[in-house]
Structures are given as C-alpha cells and as structure tokens.
Amino acid sequence: QSPIYSTPPWGVPDQDEFLNAILIVNVAQTPRELLRRGQRLEAAAERRRTRKWGPRTLDVDIIQVIDANGVELVSEDPELILPHPWARHRAFVLVPWLAADPEARLLGVPVREIVEKLDIADVEAVVEA
C-alpha cells in the first residue's frame, strides 16, 4: 500500500483536492470480478456518479493486472481496458504506485522512468503508509 497523496482535482477544478493511494493485491479473482468488487466498494461508500470527474466518496480503478505467470494482461474490452488507459499520464496514479512498488513496470516500462517525465509538483504525501 502507498502513502495517501493529496493532489489538485483532475478534470473539474472547482472541487476539493483529491486523495489518492495505490493498493497492490494478490487475488484469485478475474479482472472482471475485481471490477465488480471495486464497484461494490464504491456503492458501499455511497458513491454517486452525477458529474464526470466530479466529487466522489470513493473511486476504485484497476490500473494493472498481472496473471499468475507474471504476465501483464492487456485488454481492449470497453468495460475494463487494461492497463488503465490514462495511468501513464497521471502523476496522482504513478507517484503512489512507485511508492508502493519501486520496481513497478507499466507495459514493460519502469514506472520510475514514466514519472520522471511528468510534472509531480502538486503530488504531496499527506499520510504515510
């Protein structure tokens, strides 16, 4: 698990800051089952999808799935694109991920190298793991 990071809101600036963290989990579930589990967690947190990129109580995204053989799964299924299509552009995803797993790779590229190309000035750890 990463520290919790605070970042300015993404997409719609007129809202409170975002709090972001990464959890790395080992499960026997399929990616689709993980998606459903994340959606149940969001529902339990009373998430309401009223405005795209708007405020939410919880937002669970599946960034990457690695199978039992250590192979990164790639999917173009519109319901669950893997790896997450915007992850490589979002410091608020990659900085916590790097903190949780300094050896992380995304599509074969070290996450550290991707982070080095991003503006991370607004990504600030507020709660340590």
Summary of predicted features, one role per range:
Residues 2-26:
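Short, charge-patterned binding micro-sites
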Residues 10-19, 32-129:
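Flexible, gly/pro- and Lys/Arg-enriched active-site loops
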